[in-house]
């Protein structure tokens, strides 16, 4: 199985907020975001990072050494800078996609709790696609609920997917994509992306991996959803800063309870 992490965007929103490093390398809980991403996939055989040329050639950023530290045996595909989304990036790196094994495309700006071995088993069971999803309340949805949402039929198959808009007025009751997209083989992935770009399945001129499944649905391929546990969103500066503030608050509360409330009762 191959893990593909497109991280070739410009990251303008973080730049505008004064962040010096590209988003995947900003640290949270003592690790760069991209390391949290890779650690979601223990034991995966192949990892491919897709980075933009501008970042890669900036010697101050040290992109290659940073990525090697995260995953020493990963491939790094360097492509021209663009604003056309992850599917476009993957197509530019197509020579490094493993055509014959299952491929998981994972965005570079979140983490989650989940059962990766179970996800792997289901993707390897012969289906064409598998999308990791979450539902219910998650703190980032207080600010923004504009994510990719799935419509599933009674047989558990994906029949529609759309970006930045829920299908109903109650998005927390719908399956939302976390940003982990499985494809039965790399060939299935590349064929679907080629069709996606040919038909213009994009949002605001960006080719999202969620919308790659549109052509697969139309051709009758089998795509399922896989429910994860907790989802941690770091995609925008606001998401990132909210998470840090919430984590610091609850860490302080835990510290206070242990040191000020419980400690007097258990001095030894």
Predicted regions and their residues:
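Conserved N-terminal catalytic core of the sugar/cofactor nucleotidyltransferase
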Residues: 2-5, 13-15, 27, 31-105, ...
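The conserved acidic donor/metal-binding loop of glycosyltransferases
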Residues: 107-111
């Amino acid at each position: 199985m191959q893990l593909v992490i497109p991280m070739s965007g410009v990251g303008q929103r973080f730049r505008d907020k004064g962040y010096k490093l590209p988003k995947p390398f900003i640290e949270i809980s003592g690790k760069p975001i991209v390391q949290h991403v890779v650690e979601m996939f223990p034991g995966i055989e192949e990892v491919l990072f897709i980075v933009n040329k501008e970042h890669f050639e900036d010697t101050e950023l040290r992109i290659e050494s940073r990525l090697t530290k995260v995953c020493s045996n990963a491939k790094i595909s360097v492509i021209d800078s663009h604003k056309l989304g992850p599917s476009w990036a993957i197509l530019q790196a197509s020579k490094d996609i493993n055509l014959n094994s299952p491929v998981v495309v994972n965005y570079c700006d979140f983490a989650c709790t989940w059962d990766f071995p179970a996800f792997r088993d289901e993707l390897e069971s012969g289906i064409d696609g598998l999308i990791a999803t979450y539902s219910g309340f998650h703190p980032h949805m207080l600010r923004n609920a504009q994510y990719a949402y799935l419509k599933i039929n009674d047989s558990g198959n994906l029949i529609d997917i759309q970006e930045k808009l829920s299908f109903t007025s109650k998005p927390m009751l719908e399956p939302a994509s976390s940003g982990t997209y499985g494809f039965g083989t790399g060939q299935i992935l590349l064929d679907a992306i080629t069709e996606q770009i040919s038909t213009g399945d994009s949002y605001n001129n960006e080719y999202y991996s969620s919308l790659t499944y549109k052509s697969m649905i139309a051709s009758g391929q089998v795509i399922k959803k896989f429910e994860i546990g907790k989802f941690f969103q770091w995609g925008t500066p606001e998401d990132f800063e909210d998470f840090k503030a919430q984590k610091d608050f609850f860490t302080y509360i835990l510290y206070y309870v242990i040191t000020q409330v419980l400690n007097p009762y258990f001095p030894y």
